């Protein structure tokens, strides 16, 4: 089991596709190098931004394998391994465990509409069947379930549940969880627009970010400045993060992020159905913001 303490800005990597919708492995490898060279603290393959739900199991395994190989332990990896099927989640989590990733990111099960007890038993089953650190992924805007703090604290009480990624934007949640459980755990926000507030008010330890695909250095600089008590520098960087986050979610993620990366790095904006590429109106929004931030 990894002993790495997980904190900082972890980029939720896009999965680049070629025009025929196959995985562009060469571009994915270059994207990882770009992230690491821009001081990102960690990487998250096969999360929401990585379009994991449209990957076959074989493709999923290849993306994780390639990320581990290219990264070569230079930064920690939290691998997405969740689904709404407990047995499938166990299968994926055992796979990422075999590659010695630093943690698995397990989403709250969606679509089935499980009860509180069902959610707990899902995480307990994955926990008990594996030996890799697990991070809860709470994103109710996609799962239609927002577990209450008591339930989250109960899940966090399991020994190898080491943290949570909370994408609600609720900066009070970390404080509430700390009151409910006597255990040190990683507190990642998944809401780019409120990441600095999550640090300042909630005691957050990091962000798993879609926006950092586009601005890894600005994002890591914000984190580093805040924890070095350089608040003005952190706020200046956060201004860019906040502005960009507003346009990168103008349409379903990761379509706007992929379009931005096509303008900055020449990466294909191709997404897999049922997602589609940006409308012309939204393309213009992204282009204008990138110009405003001097990114193109």
Curated annotation (Swiss-Prot):
Q: Name one GO cellular component term.
A: cytosol
Q: Site described as Part of a proton relay during catalysis, positions?
A: 48, 111
Give the Enzyme Commission number: 4.3.3.7
GO molecular function annotation = 4-hydroxy-tetrahydrodipicolinate synthase activity
The pathway it acts in is: Amino-acid biosynthesis; L-lysine biosynthesis via DAP pathway; (S)-tetrahydrodipicolinate from L-aspartate: step 3/4
- Give the UniProt keywords, A-Z: Amino-acid biosynthesis, Cytoplasm, Diaminopimelate biosynthesis, Lyase, Lysine biosynthesis, Schiff base
Q: Name one GO biological process term.
A: diaminopimelate biosynthetic process
Its primary localisation, in coarse terms, equals cytoplasm
What InterPro entries does the record point to? Aldolase_TIM, DapA, DapA-like
Query: What subcellular compartments does it reside in?
Result: Cytoplasm
Please list the residues that make up the active site: 137 (proton donor/acceptor), 165 (schiff-base intermediate with substrate)
Question: Which residues are noted in the entry as pyruvate-binding?
Answer: 49, 208
Q: Provide the catalytic activity annotation.
A: L-aspartate 4-semialdehyde + pyruvate = (2S,4S)-4-hydroxy-2,3,4,5-tetrahydrodipicolinate + H2O + H(+)
Output the PANTHER family linked to this UniProt entry: 4-HYDROXY-2-OXOGLUTARATE ALDOLASE, MITOCHONDRIAL, DIHYDRODIPICOLINATE SYNTHASE
Q: What does this protein do?
A: Catalyzes the condensation of (S)-aspartate-beta-semialdehyde [(S)-ASA] and pyruvate to 4-hydroxy-tetrahydrodipicolinate (HTPA).
Q: How does it assemble?
A: Homotetramer; dimer of dimers.
State the HAMAP family in the record: DapA (MF_00418)
Family, as annotated: Belongs to the DapA family.
The molecule here is called 4-hydroxy-tetrahydrodipicolinate synthase
Which source organism does the UniProt entry give?
Ehrlichia canis (strain Jake)
